[in-house]
Amino acid sequence: MAKKVDKVVKLQIPAGKANPAPPVGPALGQAGVNIMGFCKEFNARTQDQAGLIIPVEISVYEDRSFTFITKTPPAPVLLKKAAGIEKGSGEPNKAKVATVTKDQVREIANSKMQDLNAADEEAAMRIIEGTARSMGIVVE
């Protein structure tokens, strides 16, 4: 018989840098999870993606055991990395802060494909282009 899920905790944590300090500690402490066990497992699983923020969905079961799924980094994080900027524009419709190429957008769309609600690569690219536009990044 499958274990019954008690709680689902969603967090965004820098890859390889999970520690018991906030926000990880309090969120998992309330759910009754072994915080150090999670931190070690998460850091081991994400050490090759250093510098990126990784969304994680932790399923906590009634017996306080847990499993977690790491997702692909958020599109804005990948776009900022591709454009080489710290943050997007404060006024995206007026002030453009950077440019990215269609190839960079295609690469991001392919890496995000499993998490996007898109039927094909073209639709995924349009989603990423829309995100770029709302950040003040021009797509060439």
Swiss-Prot record:
UniProt key word Ribonucleoprotein: yes
InterPro entries listed in its UniProt record: Ribosomal_uL11, Ribosomal_uL11_bac-typ, Ribosomal_uL11_C, Ribosomal_uL11_C_sf, Ribosomal_uL11_CS, Ribosomal_uL11_N, Ribosomal_uL11_N_sf
CDD domains: Ribosomal_L11
GO terms classed as biological process: translation
GO terms assigned for molecular function: large ribosomal subunit rRNA binding; structural constituent of ribosome
Listed PROSITE patterns: RIBOSOMAL_L11
Protein origin, superkingdom: Bacteria
SUPFAM superfamilies given in the database record: Ribosomal L11/L12e N-terminal domain, Ribosomal protein L11, C-terminal domain
Pfam families to which the protein is assigned, alphabetical: Ribosomal_L11, Ribosomal_L11_N
Gene3D superfamilies recorded: Ribosomal protein L11, C-terminal domain (1.10.10.250), Ribosomal protein L11/L12, N-terminal domain (3.30.1550.10)
GO cellular component: cytosolic large ribosomal subunit
Modification(s) after translation: One or more lysine residues are methylated.
Keyword set, alphabetical order: Methylation, Ribonucleoprotein, Ribosomal protein, RNA-binding, rRNA-binding
Family as reported in the entry's similarity comment: Belongs to the universal ribosomal protein uL11 family.
HAMAP family the UniProt entry points to: Ribosomal_uL11 (MF_00736)
Assembly behavior: Part of the ribosomal stalk of the 50S ribosomal subunit. Interacts with L10 and the large rRNA to form the base of the stalk. L10 forms an elongated spine to which L12 dimers bind in a sequential fashion forming a multimeric L10(L12)X complex.
Chain's role: Forms part of the ribosomal stalk which helps the ribosome interact with GTP-bound translation factors.
Protein name as it appears in the record: Large ribosomal subunit protein uL11
Organism: Staphylococcus aureus (strain bovine RF122 / ET3-1)
